């Protein structure tokens, strides 16, 4: 095996990877089923990894959302949470943290990111309207469509080629954005959404320059710019590492600049705020919009000072916002992805490159060139990883994309990924090596693997519930 060495500030020696910047205080046992048991379990789950029981999973890479390990400070905060129905001090601690980090005047906590979308998009969108994004994630797209509007993706073309290595592959295609605005009419564009990092494109970051250019277009046509901020801290770290002029800026300074270009943000705090539950809706200065959002929050989430969360959730979220922007933590976090990517490079396994923030997106189309898009190569690899090593992942491709709402025909995604989303502060380097070894083993027998067909699907967000069966 080739060993990749790196230099790290504080060490004179060369090291193979960035070690965990924490000590482990509490552990949870996990079990490994036999191969025969795993094959039975995935068949019982109708070959949908979302249907597997957590106790039957050895390494859970289904999502990095809400699966993180909280710190001792966060757990101490749980005990200090103020459970007052209205005006609890944990709410004000959270509001102060959001204002300090993001610089927004108005803050509304919600139970998770999709709740923020539900509150907001019902006000900005509707029949005949459009939402344009560098890429909508699945729940964002669903809330756009539930409002009666249409979602249009507008990512740079390089994002569709996993082999192209550019530093900011999640960027908005600004020329296409302006063309779409002119084509549909500015009055029909309810919102422009910038997803950072760009999850569906492989956790790829967006540059400050691209944020600026997008904001200028939105201002020119009087369209609100909203940041989907689920992985904003990872995006800021990539800017510090990759964008000229930002190498000496702090993560917090970069975050302030990113958010200065937008009007609104929605955030699933279950990612970069390192909590198990929570979300945020931030509005920079539009008090009228904030008042409308508060009314919808009371209807959907609960009173405005708890937003569907307990006081202990609010307290741990306020602490986690600061822990998630710590540069030592982010260096380790991204280092895990870079180490796994280096193992895959050595084995000749293609992935969305350069590696993104919260996981490695393996190019299943490249691994299974004989399996067409409508037999879901990304889902095939997800099933094979569970069979091989008890690893649960999910597909990001045609299976998740679903059917054309007008024709009912299966849509073809630009890429067929299997996402290995790594939870924060949960898995060690040994687990990362198991992930790599499992993928290498599957690659060796890839030509024997067959596709799947859907036997049942719901009308919206089918990948969460659909049933599949292997093709003979």
Curated annotation (Swiss-Prot):
CDD domains associated with the record: Tnase_like (cd00617)
Keywords, sorted A to Z: Lyase, Pyridoxal phosphate, Tryptophan catabolism
Cofactor(s) annotated in UniProt: pyridoxal 5'-phosphate
One of the Pfam families matching this protein, by short name: Beta_elim_lyase
Chain positions found as N6-(pyridoxal phosphate)lysine: 271
Reaction(s) this enzyme catalyzes, per UniProt: L-tryptophan + H2O = indole + pyruvate + NH4(+)
SUPFAM superfamilies: PLP-dependent transferases
Keyword Lyase: yes
Pathway listed: Amino-acid degradation; L-tryptophan degradation via pyruvate pathway; indole and pyruvate from L-tryptophan: step 1/1
This enzyme's EC code(s): 4.1.99.1
GO molecular function: tryptophanase activity
Subunit structure of this chain's protein: Homotetramer.
Family: Belongs to the beta-eliminating lyase family.
Cross-referenced PANTHER family: BETA-ELIMINATING LYASE-LIKE PROTEIN-RELATED, TRYPTOPHANASE
This protein's name: Tryptophanase
The organism of origin for this protein: Clostridium tetani (strain Massachusetts / E88)
């Amino acid at each position: 095996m080739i060993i990749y060495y790196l230099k790290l500030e504080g060490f004179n020696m060369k090291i193979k990877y960035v070690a965990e910047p924490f000590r482990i205080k509490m552990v949870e046992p996990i079990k490994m089923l036999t191969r025969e048991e795993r094959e039975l379990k995935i068949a019982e789950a109708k070959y949908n990894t979302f249907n597997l029981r957590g106790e039957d999973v050895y390494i859970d890479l289904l999502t990095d959302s809400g699966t993180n390990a909280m710190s001792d400070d966060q757990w101490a905060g749980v005990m200090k949470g103020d459970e007052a129905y209205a005006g609890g001090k944990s709410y004000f601690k959270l509001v102060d943290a959001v204002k300090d980090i993001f610089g927004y005047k108005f803050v509304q906590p919600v139970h998770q990111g999709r709740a923020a979308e539900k509150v907001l998009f019902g006000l900005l969108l509707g029949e005949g309207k459009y939402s344009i994004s560098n890429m909508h994630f699945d729940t964002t797209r669903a809330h756009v469509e539930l409002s009666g509007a249409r979602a249009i993706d507008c990512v740079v073309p390089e994002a569709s080629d996993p082999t192209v290595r550019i530093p900011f592959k999640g960027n908005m295609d600004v020329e296409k954005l302006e063309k779409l605005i002119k084509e549909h009419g500015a009055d029909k564009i309810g919102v422009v959404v910038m997803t950072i990092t760009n999850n569906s494109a492989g956790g790829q970051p967006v540059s400050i320059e691209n944020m600026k250019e997008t904001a200028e277009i939105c201002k020119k046509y009087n369209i609100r710019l909203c940041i989907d901020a689920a992985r904003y801290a990872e995006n800021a770290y990539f800017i510090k590492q990759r964008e000229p002029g930002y190498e000496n800026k702090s993560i917090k300074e970069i975050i302030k600049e990113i958010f200065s270009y937008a009007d609104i943000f929605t955030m699933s705090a279950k990612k970069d705020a390192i909590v198990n539950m929570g979300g945020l809706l931030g509005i920079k200065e539009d008090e009228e919009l904030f008042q409308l959002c508060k009314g919808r929050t009371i209807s959907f989430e609960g009173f405005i000072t708890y937003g569907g969360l307990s006081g202990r959730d609010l307290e741990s979220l306020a602490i986690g916002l600061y822990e998630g922007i710590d540069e030592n933590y982010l260096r380790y976090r991204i280092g895990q992805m870079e180490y796994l990517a280096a193992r895959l490079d050595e084995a000749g396994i293609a992935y969305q490159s350069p590696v993104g923030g919260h996981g490695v997106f393996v190019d299943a189309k490249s691994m299974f060139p004989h399996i067409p898009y409508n037999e879901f190569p990304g889902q095939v690899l997800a099933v094979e990883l569970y069979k091989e090593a008890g690893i649960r992942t999910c597909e990001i491709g045609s299976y998740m994309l679903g059917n054309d709402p007008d024709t009912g025909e299966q849509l073809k995604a630009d890429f067929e990924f299997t996402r290995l989303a790594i939870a924060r502060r949960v898995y060690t380097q040994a687990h990362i090596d198991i992930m790599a070894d499992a993928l290498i083993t599957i690659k060796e027998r890839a030509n024997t693997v067959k596709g799947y067909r859907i036997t049942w699907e719901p009308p919206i967000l089918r990948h969460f519930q659909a049933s599949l069966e292997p093709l003979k």
